[in-house]
């Protein structure tokens, strides 16, 4: 595909680049890449989903070096940029500049904050039902973020989560100590900092995650921080619910 690079600022993309992993396939139409940011304490994942129309949905974008961007563009045309929470604004302006026709989508409750960085064209709550994609609003949290449900073949689905479940290993240094002391690292869980920001009500959220654990069609759960849930997903979700 042709990328429209504004001549006024040909280096705009280079300024967005920080270390990242290669694109990794999770399923035939689902990929993840992990990027790091100097101002962020935890790496962040971008999840890429390809629809039946060969259009790409980019969830929590991460700017990639040109070889990886060409690899991404070879998968399909970037058509939807999901900003899953107002705090995930890094790189969004650069992606809109690179792909002027991309749809900019975020949760309704995050629009005011995201709009400080880029114009939001659609809310998740309106956009995805119109396009045949399920968008969950988990009970017991502020609606600043939600969960996307996408098909991955053979009657199975993937859940694209944001910060709701974090799965980071123990980290070094003082911040790593804080994570360990607050039981926020080492295994998949709803961590302390997320519980505070989303004002989690434990009982309804626990019931929601426990209900997900009962489903047998959930093959993958992606996260914005740490490793995605790829094996023993039902039991892992059950443990997350019990731990909450």
For each feature predicted by the language model, list its residue ranges.
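Catalytic core of the metallo-beta-lactamase
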Residues: 2-63, 119-183, 204-217
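Active-site metal-binding motif and surrounding structural segment of the metallo-beta-lactamase
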Residues: 57, 63-106
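Active-site environment of divalent metal-dependent phosphoester hydrolases
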Residues: 65-66, 87-91, 111-114, 166-169, ...
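Proline-aspartate-enriched helix->loop->beta-strand connector
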Residues: 78, 217-223
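Short, polar loop motifs at secondary-structure junctions
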Residues: 87, 106-113, 122-126
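Short loop/helix-cap segments at secondary-structure boundaries that form the rim of catalytic
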Residues: 95-96, 111-118, 129
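Short glycine/proline- and acidic residue-enriched helix-loop micro-motifs
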Residues: 185-199
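Binuclear metal-ion centers of metallo-dependent hydrolases, dominated by the metallo-beta-lactamase
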Residues: 225, 231-244
């Amino acid at each position: 595909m042709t990328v429209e690079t504004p001549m006024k600022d040909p280096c705009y993309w280079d300024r967005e680049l920080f270390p990242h992993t290669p694109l990794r396939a999770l399923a035939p139409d689902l990929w993840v890449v992990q990027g790091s940011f100097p101002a962020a304490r935890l790496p962040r994942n971008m999840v890429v989903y390809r629809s039946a129309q060969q259009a790409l949905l980019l969830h929590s974008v991460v700017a990639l070096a040109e070889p990886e961007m060409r690899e991404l563009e070879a998968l399909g045309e970037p058509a939807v940029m999901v900003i899953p929470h107002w705090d995930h604004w890094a790189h969004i302006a650069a992606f809109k500049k690179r792909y002027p026709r991309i749809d900019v989508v975020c949760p309704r409750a995050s629009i005011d904050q995201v709009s400080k960085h880029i114009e939001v064209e659609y809310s998740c709550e309106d956009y995805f039902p119109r396009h045949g994609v399920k968008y969950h609003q988990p009970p017991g949290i502020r609606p600043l973020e939600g969960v996307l449900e996408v098909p991955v073949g053979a009657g199975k689905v993937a859940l694209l989560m944001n910060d709701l479940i974090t799965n980071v290993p123990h980290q070094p240094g003082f911040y790593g100590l804080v994570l360990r002391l607050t039981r926020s690292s080492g295994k998949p869980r709803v961590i302390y900092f997320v519980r505070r920001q989303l004002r989690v009500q434990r009982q309804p959220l626990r019931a929601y995650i426990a209900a997900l654990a009962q489903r047998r069609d959930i093959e993958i759960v992606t996260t914005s921080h740490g490793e995605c849930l790829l094996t023993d997903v039902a039991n892992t979700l059950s443990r997350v619910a019990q731990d909450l």
